[in-house]
Amino acid sequence: MKKVLLATALSLCVASAFAADTAVLQVKGKLTNAACTPQLSNGGVVDYGTIHLGELSATAVNQLGDKDINLTITCGAPTQVGWVVNDDRESSKAGINVDFNGTMQNISYYQYGVGKTIGGVNIGNYMLFIKNKKVTIDGQEGDEIFSNVDWNGSKWESGGAVRSDGISIISAATTGTTTPVAFTTAVFPLVTSLAIQGTDTLAITDDTSLDGQATITLKYL
């Protein structure tokens, strides 16, 4: 039955192909000098400083709070552009709850790893979001919006936490709308929220550095 249906479908396609004398092929694109550059404040480093193990819970997840870092995108001319994030330390995510705006979250694609102990234990994870879902667009306040890559730009929604798997494109819109706007400069006030495992699980005996790293990539719209 499947072969018959397939043959029928192919026959219909062939018949359709010869129903007209011509077909139109279009090749489209856009050449532009409006290249954009992303830049993070503080050299791209979010520093939680020295964390004393003796001040942490041995058995419960330790919420270490929020830190701010700005992402500024500058373009040579007004440009519609967004960005995605990929976690370079994905294998070190601990899968523990993170305090996201007062709500505990542990959805994997919203979490980023921060490295492992010498013993191979995943230290913890953090979340990344945009403060108050607001963006400064050419000096004016606007809104954070996002669109998943498999939506192919067909829809945009109000923003939230930033996915760590490169699936969601983050961009900027005029306040109260969800349509990307062209800009020359946009500032996205990023916030990290960090949690690490209890010290009994970490079993750290020597100084251990947090080693979170993520890559931000621009996407022209």
What is the predicted role of each segment?
Residues 1-20:
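Gram-negative bacterial Sec-dependent N-terminal signal peptides
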Residues 19-221:
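Mature extracellular/passenger domains of Gram-negative fimbrial/pilin and adhesin proteins
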